[in-house]
Swiss-Prot record:
Gene this protein is translated from: glk
The name this protein goes by in its record: Glucokinase
Organism of derivation: Aeropyrum pernix (strain ATCC 700893 / DSM 11879 / JCM 9820 / NBRC 100138 / K1)
Record field: temperature dependence: Activity increases exponentially up to 100 degrees Celsius, the highest temperature tested.
Entry similarity comment: Belongs to the ROK (NagC/XylR) family.
GO terms assigned for molecular function: ATP binding; glucokinase activity; N-acylmannosamine kinase activity; UDP-N-acetylglucosamine 2-epimerase activity
Cofactor entry: a divalent metal cation
């Protein structure tokens, strides 16, 4: 079976892998420099590091942060990188001149990967949610991958989950968005906002949040893991916002299952999943109960999604 080069362009990491028959044979990663020129250098370096004969690759799949201009294969206006436009299709065609290149939003590609290869493979109606630097989603309905007119039918991180949110704007400019509360880059800010109304014990994390000294989502989860009451309050709020988002997804797409991945969720799923499921019971009526499942491929969810869109092109997905 022919090999596929699978590329995962995330906000923090860029991964490239050689995948054959659904099995990753080799993989490398580098930090995303956040610029178009820097990304091209990183991709070239990854290809060289993997020993890929770039002139002989038949298929390339790329799972990318968005928003996308899917018809051109460009990243346009992403709040998570510096360059306003990244001509990803152009970069990949330069690097792999004889290849057929497929590009999709990372969460959309992951949904297709789960549908073709994951533990719920063949389930005709499923959703995939990534909780990582940001929050995104992808959906298969009736066995078809939903794309939207520009490839952005899946930007569920910008669902409003708190109309009274006073924590500042999302990276896109909106307020009260799921991503602005539960996205990894915003969790430190979420802790600071919640600290202003906290009436419980003055814990270490509470004092750090009140003074704006929480530097990462990891600090919040680590404090919660050792029983910091305020940290547990923050995690519960993040889970509640996420449950509201998932309930909205259920109402909009009528999927039978939602698969959750992304580093924020996967690294903390033992803490987050039971809280999300508990809050879902309040936000979704009994008749709309939804199965919540952990992602099948861990950190390689984007890579396997990239492989899937190249291996079996979804209907209406442009090929470059």
């Amino acid at each position: 079976m022919a090999e596929v080069v699978a590329v995962d362009v995330g906000a923090t990491w860029v991964r490239m892998a050689i995948v054959r028959g659904g099995v990753i044979e080799a993989i490398k990663r580098e930090r995303n420099p956040g610029t178009e020129e820097g990304l091209e250098r990183v991709l070239q370096g990854l290809a060289e590091g993997l020993g890929i004969d770039r002139g002989r690759v038949e298929k390339v799949g790329a799972a990318s942060i968005g928003p996308l201009d899917l018809r051109r294969g460009y990243i346009v206006g992403s709040p998570n990188i510096k360059s306003h436009i990244v001509r990803l299709s152009t970069i990949l065609k330069r690097l792999f001149p004889k290849s057929k290149v497929a590009i999709a939003n990372d969460a959309v590609a992951a949904a297709w990967g789960e549908y073709l290869l994951g533990r719920l493979a063949g389930t005709p109606d499923l959703g995939y949610i990534t909780m990582s630097t940001g929050v995104g989603g992808g959906f298969v309905v009736g066995g078809r991958l939903l794309l939207g007119s520009r490839g952005n039918a899946h930007e569920v991180g910008h669902i409003v989950v708190d109309m009274g949110w006073e924590g500042g704007r999302c990276g896109c400019g909106g307020t009260g968005h799921w991503e602005a509360i539960a996205g990894g880059r915003w969790i430190p800010r979420t802790s600071s906002v919640l600290a202003r109304g906290w009436r419980g014990p003055e814990t270490s994390l509470y004092r750090a949040a009140l003074e704006g000294r929480v530097g990462s989502a990891r600090e919040v989860f680590e404090a919660a893991a050792v029983g910091d009451d305020f940290a547990l309050h923050v995690i519960d709020y993040i889970a509640r916002a996420s449950a509201a988002g998932i309930a909205s997804v259920k109402a909009a797409y009528d999927v039978d299952a939602v698969i959750i991945g992304g580093s924020v969720y996967l690294n903390n799923r033992r803490m987050l999943r039971p809280l999300i499921e508990r809050h879902l019971a309040a936000y979704a009526p009994f008749s709309s109960r939804i199965e919540v499942v952990d992602a099948s491929f861990g950190d390689n969810e984007g890579v396997m999604g990239a492989y899937a869109i190249a291996y079996r092109n979804p209907e209406d997905l442009p090929i470059f």
